[in-house]
């Protein structure tokens, strides 16, 4: 099976500095583009563990790579990365970890998954369909203030209050069960002015992040990455919006800067930083954006574990 070439592929492969006999973790298998790239660079003694909470992604991995003894996949969120690594006896031995945050292209393109405002389908949005709460269940029972808070906190939506009110008004007439229904409600609630993005972009993003606990899981995962990496190991994180990137940036700053109070009598040279940022923020080239417009908002940060 030939995998699609994912966002920032070359930059990730270079950033991971893959050793033929190394141990690597792809925390977000998706459709396997990055995992295939890692395997191409590993020797017979190298190992790659992938993770994904979407059963469709796990099925793709099992079908495409079941004969490769170097590869294994765990049907699990990367928020449980440390346990999965520990179960293999790899804690403190991992040479590289990749996290490619957010919704995947196949998830967006499948109307039945309910992630896209441009394709009519059931209002689902669960990355793992086995979890109990889907978007429709939540949107039809949440208080208006809770909806407003989610739209603002996870979508940075300026018109969160009026959209939340419009949702509550609409569901009083009949339950909201389709993506197109929600999209139409948001469009009607939006001020009639020229905007670059589709009016429902931030609303769908916010609800998806909330339903899947995306920021919570990223917040839980990052310290686990630090514990599982070997000294000299690399962490590459691709994010697609400012909320994710801000969280990653703050974690890196916390672990790579002096953060002891000044009154503590310790020399700067004696402070042991745990991470070292490698270069600055990496964005896709214009050539990549032209081939894949979805790459436009991607941002890559790479760090190395020092101690």
Swiss-Prot record:
Record's keyword terms, sorted: Cytoplasm, Methyltransferase, rRNA processing, S-adenosyl-L-methionine, Transferase
Gene Ontology terms, MF aspect: rRNA (cytosine-N4-)-methyltransferase activity
Alphabetized SUPFAM superfamilies for the sequence: Putative methyltransferase TM0872, insert domain, S-adenosyl-L-methionine-dependent methyltransferases
Enzyme Commission code: 2.1.1.199
Reactions listed under catalytic activity: cytidine(1402) in 16S rRNA + S-adenosyl-L-methionine = N(4)-methylcytidine(1402) in 16S rRNA + S-adenosyl-L-homocysteine + H(+)
Pfam families attached to this UniProt entry: Methyltransf_5 (PF01795)
GO biological process: rRNA base methylation
Principal subcellular localization: cytoplasm
Domain of life: Bacteria
Keyword Cell cycle among record annotations: no
Localization annotation: Cytoplasm
GO cellular component, one term: cytoplasm
Stretches of the chain forming a coiled coil according to its record: none
Binding of S-adenosyl-L-methionine, residues: 32-34, 52, 78, 100, 107
NCBIfam families on file: 16S rRNA (cytosine(1402)-N(4))-methyltransferase RsmH
The protein's role, per its UniProt record: Specifically methylates the N4 position of cytidine in position 1402 (C1402) of 16S rRNA.
Family the UniProt entry places it in: Belongs to the methyltransferase superfamily. RsmH family.
PANTHER family (UniProt xref): 12S RRNA N4-METHYLCYTIDINE METHYLTRANSFERASE, S-ADENOSYL-METHYLTRANSFERASE MRAW
Name recorded for this polypeptide: Ribosomal RNA small subunit methyltransferase H
Naturally occurring in which organism (per UniProt): Coxiella burnetii (strain Dugway 5J108-111)
Source lineage: Bacteria, Pseudomonadati, Pseudomonadota, Gammaproteobacteria, Legionellales
Gene: rsmH
